[in-house]
Amino acid sequence: RSLSERGARLALIGLEKAELARVAASLTGEADHWHADVTDAAAMLRTARLVQERFGTVDVVVANAGVAVGGLFRHSEPDAWRRVIEVNLIGSANTARAFLPALLDSRGYYLQVASLAAFAPAPMMTAYCASKAGAESFAHTLRTELAHHGVGVGVGYLTWTDTDMVRGADQDSTLRELRSRMRWPASRTYPLAPAVDRLATGIERRARHIYAQPWLRTAQLLRAALPSAATHRARRALPALEPASATIPTTLLGAGGAANDPAPRSDA
């Protein structure tokens, strides 16, 4: 909505077909939507062609599809753990590959949505942290390959923000308890609107780094110290949480996780 109000024409792509249609219809500017799974490389290629046929040009691509699971790695369900990597990392690469020809034509901009989890390890979030670290590195490396073509590549960083994924995480009693033991400002859930406005402004500026919460810029500067700090706090928090974590099923969090099913996901 923020981008639409700033004059962007929008192509919305994702799994939640009814939600995509509802949002597209609610926007003030021109918009269309396609139902596709980012982990399906062939479907993303077809969808990219349809988007280009519909709009003629693609100036900006935002790779924002993401899912998460919680729980200790040794108790995690392998397929759910793998799915997080497939969506968050492989899906981002599929998105970039599908739209890269259009971005090369327009000398456009690709934004990879990452997370504080890309450089700050969070216990019980191994798949999410690994996927976001990989997505961050992928985007930085892609920038080096595309700079001489005039294509910009940015990385967006968010911490706990009021989305359906975070609300889903708060329904997991062990994750909720673990979060309550974090220090401020990492323990807080941040409102969506300011984060979205910073992302939209960063897209307009073709920014290399976008921090949805301003304090993440400082955290980025301290990233070398964060693994040791996280380990120190986990030593104290995890002994009380491990027994409960072992009994909680590994499920994808939030509405995005609920939309993840084995049925075919592309109309393209």
How should these model regions be labeled?
Residues 8-22:
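Conserved glycine-rich Rossmann-like NAD(P)H-binding loop of the short-chain dehydrogenase/reductase
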Residues 17, 36-46, 78:
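The beta1-alpha1 cofactor-binding region of Rossmann-like NAD(H)/NADP(H)-dependent oxidoreductases
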Residues 72-73, 77-82:
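Substrate-binding pocket helix/loop in short-chain dehydrogenase/reductase
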Residues 73-74, 122-126:
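Active-site loop immediately N-terminal to the catalytic Tyr-X3-Lys motif
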Residues 96, 131:
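Active-site helix of classical SDR
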Residues 115:
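Residue(s) in the substrate-gating loop at a strand-loop-helix junction
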Residues 144-214:
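SDR active-site lid
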